Amino acid sequence: TRLATTKAFWFEASDGEQVQAQLTLPPDAKTSKLPVIVMPHGGPNARDFVRFDPFVQTFANRGYAVLQVNFRGSSGFGKAYEAAGFKQWGGLMQEDVIDGFKQVVSDPNLNLDADRACVVGASYGGYVALTASFKNADLFQCFVSIAGISDIGSLLQSEFYTRMSETRAMNAARHGDPVVDRALLAGDSAINH
């Protein structure tokens, strides 16, 4: 079995920001339209790389195109890029993933099937899948959340009281304060939808 090739690219998000992503296509793609798996990374302060990923390769081997978006808030693209994701779990970070999906399925050269698409993710990526299920349900046929965060406020509340004060301050700046930002966190949590 041949490995699929992953190609990195940049696209323009709906608000004009440049966002990095990568697309993996099956090694023996046929002429028929390919189903798509959108696979956001965990973290969210992490990133995907163009390198061997057993999950991506397995999906590609089974005939799926796999899109991985390094949404704002991802590490490795500079401090400003990472900071642009602060308190944006269900906002700009989510929109970047959706914009990336819309970009690739609208490219006629890629031959992707927008009507056969799924979001699959773990940890923060699972959160993206859950959030897509209530914010973007019209775009996808399935949502798979593996250990995804369904209640951001609850997560931050538990970390707020169990971690050192420096970590609490960092979490409040990056993700939100469980008390001060309660409404924002509740609105972006799948448990409330």
Predicted stretch roles:
Residues 8-11, 40-43, 56-59, 85-88, ...:
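Short, low-complexity, polar/charged sequence segments that are solvent-exposed and flexible
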Residues 10, 15, 23-27, 44, ...:
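Short, well-ordered turn and helix-capping elements at secondary-structure junctions
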Residues 16, 37, 137:
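ATP/adenylate-binding site constellation spanning eukaryotic-like Ser/Thr protein kinases
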Residues 29-34, 39-78, 152:
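Short substrate-entry loop that stabilizes the transition state in hydrolases
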Residues 69-193:
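Active-site-proximal cap/loop segments of hydrolase catalytic domains
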